[in-house]
Structure formats: structure tokens, C-alpha cells
Amino acid sequence: MKGNLDWQPTLINIEPEFANFVPTFRNGQIVRDLMPDQPAMTLNADFYFPEDRVVVELKCMETDSRDAYPERVARAFAHFGHTGSELMGFLFRGEPMPERVAGRIRQQIANPLRQALRKANRQIAATKHHLNIPDAFGLAVFANDNNFGLTPANALSILGNAALGLSNCHVDGFVYMTPNVYHHTGDDIARSVWVPLYSEGKESLADFVNSFGNAWIDYAEQFGEPYLERWKGDEYDVGLLTGKPIERFSRSRK
């Protein structure tokens, strides 16, 4: 959680910095370093924490779900046989979007996250097999790097529903974090999030994840000004989960 309206965010190069951070926390290891003889294209997760027996896969969300939105809407209207006049009615006359069209667009927005979670599940499973750690926890971390079309609640809903649909699930929990996307919640503070969810019966992973998140936030603080405040708790803040991403920060005139 960061500063006021005069503050400007410092963006983090997430993938390399997360890889730099991991060895500083509980002897975290880069999985590729543990498998030097495996072919370069071998499917594997990113990190392993042997002291906690946790395999972690990091996924960066670099594509904005709003990209090509008008074209997506037009195609969805046409897909269900709606006329050009009906499309114009939605775009320019304030007429409601047909539910079938809205459902198709929601599905298209959700698909990249669903696919990323399914791949993370395969990568975690492969890593547990390669390292012979069948009982290790699996954690998928989703870092929003450039997607200003999703609130935290949107992302958590998509990921939660996708996790329920995994077959042979190896993802015991996931984290949604927004190191490069900040949210407006009605005050003058731009806020980022680290929000975990766990599979039923895997809540014991929480101690690791909470410490992991605190350590990452400490590490990330070096890239900008100190955080004004931190909030943590067992209950999710509705205002934060529904906070709209801030695409542009204004600069004060002096």
C-alpha cells in the first residue's frame, strides 16, 4: 500500500526481481538449478522451499484484459446474431448488453487466467515428480503486471472457480498480488494487494504464505518510497477487493 495523489509508482521488473528475492527467504531455491541434467524444455515450476516443502510457480499477468475490447464486443454481438443497430444501441444509446453477449465476454476475459492456472498445476506436478517430493505443497503466485481491467475480486473469482475445476489438482493455494497495479478505494492512498486463497484442508499453508508475502513486501519496498501503511488480517477488505485499478497517476502542479 503506497502513497498519496502526488506519489508516482516505481514499477518492478517482477520475474527477475522475484527470482532474486526467493533465495533470501528460507533458503528458497530456483528449480532449474536443482535439475541441471534435465532438457531445457522440461516442464517445471519456478521455485522450491525445502524447509517448508513448498513448490511455487510465478505467473505474470502482462496483457490488459481491456485490449481490443470494442472488437471483442462487436464479435460477441455478431456471434449471437444481433444486428448492427443492437450493437449501436449498447455502444451509444445506453441499452443493456444482452446477457449471452456479456457471458461470452466474461469467459474470454477469464480464459487467460484459467489457462495459466492449469499450466501452473502441470508445472507443479512435474516438479514434484522430478524432485521426488510427492507430498510437497503447491503454490501458484499470480502477479498483475499490466492488467488494468480486473479488480482483485474479479481475479480471485476467476482463479477460485478455475481451481475447483482442476483435475488431479496439485495447487494447494494461490496468491493474487499486484506489485505494479495499484487500486483506488475512495481515499488518497494507492493500494496494492497480496491476497491468498487455499484449497479446503490446506489451510496449514497459510503460515508459509503470510511470511512469504511479508518478506516479499519488505524486499519490494527498496524499489520506491516506504509504504505509508500495511494492513493484514484474516478477513478480506471489501473496499480493497473491489477497488478499481489506477491506470494513470496525476502529478501536482507546483
Regions found by a protein language model. Name each.
Residues 48-56:
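Active-site beta-strand-loop-beta-strand hairpin of nuclease catalytic cores
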Residues 27, 52, 170-172:
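A generic structural signal for alpha->beta connector loops
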Residues 43:
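Beta-rich catalytic cores
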Residues 2-10, 17-21, 61-205, 222-254:
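Metal-dependent nuclease catalytic core centered on acidic motifs
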Residues 5-39:
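Short N-terminal edge-element motif at the start of the domain
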